[in-house]
Amino acid sequence: FAAGITSFKMYLTYPAMMIGDGAVYSALKALKKRGGIAGVHCENAGVIDALIAAHKAAGQTAPSSHPECRPNPLEAEAVAHLLRITEVAGVPIVIVHLSTKEALLEVMRARARGQQVYVETCPHYLLLDDSVYYQEDYSAAARYICAPPMRKKEDQEVLWKALANGTIQTVSTDHCSFTLQQKDAGRGDFTKIPGGLPGVETRGELLYTAGVAAGRITKEQMCALLSENPARLYGAYPRKGVIAPGSDADLVVYDPAADKTITAGTQLSAAGYTPYEGWRTKGSIAQVYLRGTLAVDHGEMKAGPIGTYIPRHPGAL
């Protein structure tokens, strides 16, 4: 906290990273004393492991087993479990990369009890569904492995409505730049496929296209989801998240008339692929300014490493 780090991530799954209920509670109480906040990945690790063992015993090791071993109820159960712990601890909490209608219902129940619960989702949960895992081409299916996995189209519609009515506060990427070669290293065992997708470069254009241009959300809501709300929630506001005297001149210039086709050939990420290959966007990002300096111009980097460390304060939405 002395260095200005006020937000932390915890996991209820992944054996190498998850912590037990007592440790979660103790960490939340420590954060409460200092005004910090935690973002938590919520899936039921024990049942997921049992389902994985059953699939492997049956010889079911293709990417299609991935969503079947991480079904909707196991995200919802973990969210409900965490929210009861945070109720006892008396702290606000962030549910990161929420993907299901059932998990969102648990959030709404907690809010009805008076709890402060914030929600993040990602473009891939808004735009992709679990059919991507059932492709015959192993490599094509493997590139979509992430956790939570893609869900059903009905989950997508619930998430879009939640963005529009303010139930979800932020849209992030959960960006992971694993290459296709790294993804292929898990061939023959879906649990060995590195989990995560690249998404930093496409988030804004996809949210504008499928959200604003499609009439699901307004431009103002998009700006809040991508900028203002995260800045407030994680203690960077008003230095970040607002155009105002004294704030950093971090600006994105969006040209709604400059439609484009997303393709890996124009991506700067080390991943070398995009989950949205061939998708057409309504408009595109023209320029990105960082503290008043032109950093990106029509997809080309124009500035060197000019980032600075930003100490943060306790946030609030």
Where are the model-predicted features located?
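His/Asp/Glu-enriched, well-ordered alpha-helical/loop segment
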Residues: 61-92, 143-144, 165, 169-171, ...
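C-terminal cap of metal-dependent C-N hydrolases
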Residues: 185-189, 245-309
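Short, glycine- and charge-enriched coil/turn segments that flank and shape catalytic ligand pockets
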Residues: 59, 133-138, 185-187, 214-216, ...
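Histidine/acidic residue-rich metal-binding segments in metalloenzymes
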Residues: 1-171
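Short, solvent-exposed cationic patches
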Residues: 310-317
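Flexible loop residues that form catalytic
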Residues: 13, 98, 176, 257, ...
